């Protein structure tokens, strides 16, 4: 089974287009900060016009051994399953399906507290960790928190998994149908 992660490291994954909205630079800056304290292996899956800037940052900060890029894949689940934590760094989102998918795959989530989506999915932080949009130092602290508080984070992840039914389309359709019938 092919892996993009280094052994004996904290395995982090991020999946999303390599564009300004997804703000991968915040993630890379956070990794650059915490790499001095924690052995990290990061896989970013996606394609987009920021790929060159991302590769330059990786090269300029000697992150080649810690950070790998993989082009878009229709099914990122096998890669997400190999990770310890999923990180979303978006400046804004609608309903980030990839966050729901990561939780369904029992991955702990660290996400930006961007307008709409992550805060609701993570129930204000009860189901994962939230950090300020664009704040790589805050993200770095959250990564360290995960590494140092694994049992607590496992409980948060379990809470998030129990909340997933809210986003099940058949469950939502049943609610709408019930409302229509009662109307």
PLM ranges: what are they?
Residues 77, 84, 106:
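A short alpha->beta transition loop at the rim of the catalytic pocket in nucleotide-sugar-dependent
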Residues 108-112:
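Short hydrophobic beta-strand element within catalytic cores of glycosyltransferases
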Residues 145, 169-183:
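C-terminal alpha-helical cap of glycosyltransferases
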């Amino acid at each position: 089974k092919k892996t993009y992660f280094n052994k004996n490291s904290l395995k982090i994954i991020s999946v999303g287009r390599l564009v300004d909205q997804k703000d991968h630079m915040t993630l890379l800056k956070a990794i650059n900060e915490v790499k001095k304290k924690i052995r990290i292996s990061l896989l970013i899956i996606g394609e987009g016009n920021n790929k060159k800037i991302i590769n330059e940052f990786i090269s300029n900060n000697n992150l080649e051994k810690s950070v790998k890029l993989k082009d878009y894949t229709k099914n990122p689940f096998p890669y997400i399953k190999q990770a310890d934590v999923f990180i979303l760094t978006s400046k804004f989102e609608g309903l980030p399906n990839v966050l729901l998918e990561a939780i369904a795959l029992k991955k702990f989530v660290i996400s930006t507290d961007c307008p709409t989506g992550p805060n609701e999915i993570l129930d204000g932080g009860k189901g994962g960790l939230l950090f300020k949009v664009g704040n790589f130092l805050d993200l770095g602290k959250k990564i360290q928190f995960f590494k140092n508080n694994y049992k607590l984070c496992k409980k948060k992840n379990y809470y998030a998994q129990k909340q997933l039914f809210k986003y099940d389309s058949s469950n939502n359709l049943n609610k709408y149908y019930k409302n229509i019938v009662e109307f």
